[in-house]
Amino acid sequence: MTTYDPSQKSLGKEKLSRIPVKIEATHTPLRKPDWIRIRLSTDSKVSQLKKLLRENHLVTVCEEASCPNLNECFGHGTATFMIMGDKCTRRCSFCDVGHGRPDPLDPEEPVNLANTVSIMSLRYVVITSVDRDDLRDGGAQHYAQCINAVREKNPGIKVEVLVPDFRGRMEKALDQLAQGLPDVFNHNIETAPRLYKQARPGADYPWSLALLQTFKKRFPGIPTKSGMMLGLGETREEVEMVMRDLRQHEVDRLTLGQYLQPTRYHMPVDRYVTPQEFQELGELAKKLGFSNVASGPLVRSSYHADLQAQGERVS
């Protein structure tokens, strides 16, 4: 019997063996429909970007979360940087990022990130992270340091953050983040509250809504953003309810995308939402008052985030 070592990164079956609602391994997954087409690329830019990231000791959520758009985005020289390591303190059953006891923060990471952004000549960058429940501020100060370093090295750049929930430390985290504010504040609601215990153990639906609204009230000039994965078992009514909840909590921008099971040990895909339904939900979101909406099978919260920020249609 293998002894559990919390300092090592656990994935898949090992990671999900300790969540409160057990998930049976999928033996006959749903067949992917024709509209789920992963964009492959043999572009040398992909390998060059991976080399650059490794040289600067950086991690991307694109790689760690097995994003279906990785080759497309890397081929265009864009990436969503994941700071504070590659070991998350949570065990979300939809997510492919590894779980474990995180390593100490790298004090060189802000500078390495800023230099990499400069080399890539980015004008819009997305910064996200693992959950760091081991830190008193959830890593918010490190976020601010990264944002400030990126801006100092890259004048005129726009910075979007996709943050964890800072559960139990919201005010402290926002106090720290105030020292280096982003241009867009994103926190994903992910799914309907009924599915939280299974999909997001350790998270809390009302808390996530409160984080988004509290940030907006403290910094009203900064757009707030959130996203949902569809196909986890939610109903159409639940999706519409979540969208209304987000608007009631002053969220400005919304992304809707199809959930894709990373491994057979993760939550299974309950259904593949049709492009037509994504279009209908996107139109409803606009009617509800979201200023920017990206809704489509392969949409992810940071997919073409620069175009999303400009209000262009992304699907």
Swiss-Prot record:
Its main location: cytoplasm. The keyword Protein biosynthesis does not apply. It comes from the Bacteria. Belongs to the radical SAM superfamily. Lipoyl synthase family. This is Lipoyl synthase. InterPro entries: Aldolase_TIM, Elp3/MiaA/NifB-like_rSAM, Lipoyl_synth, rSAM. Keywords: 4Fe-4S, Cytoplasm, Iron, Iron-sulfur, Metal-binding, S-adenosyl-L-methionine, Transferase. The keyword 4Fe-4S applies. [4Fe-4S] cluster 2 binds at C88, C92, C95. GO terms for molecular function: 4 iron, 4 sulfur cluster binding; lipoate synthase activity; metal ion binding. GO terms for cellular component: cytoplasm. It catalyses: [[Fe-S] cluster scaffold protein carrying a second [4Fe-4S](2+) cluster] + N(6)-octanoyl-L-lysyl-[protein] + 2 oxidized [2Fe-2S]-[ferredoxin] + 2 S-adenosyl-L-methionine + 4 H(+) = [[Fe-S] cluster scaffold protein] + N(6)-[(R)-dihydrolipoyl]-L-lysyl-[protein] + 4 Fe(3+) + 2 hydrogen sulfide + 2 5'-deoxyadenosine + 2 L-methionine + 2 reduced [2Fe-2S]-[ferredoxin]. Pfam families: Radical_SAM. Its EC number is 2.8.1.8. [4Fe-4S] cluster 1 binds at C62, C67, C73, S302. Pathway: Protein modification; protein lipoylation via endogenous pathway; protein N(6)-(lipoyl)lysine from octanoyl-[acyl-carrier-protein]: step 2/2. Residues 73-291 form the Radical SAM core domain. Its cofactor is [4Fe-4S] cluster. It is an enzyme of class 2 (transferase). It is found in: Cytoplasm. HAMAP family: Lipoyl_synth. Gene3D superfamilies: Aldolase class I. NCBIfam families: lipA (TIGR00510), PRK05481.1 (NF004019), PRK12928.1 (NF009544). Binds 2 [4Fe-4S] clusters per subunit. One cluster is coordinated with 3 cysteines and an exchangeable S-adenosyl-L-methionine.
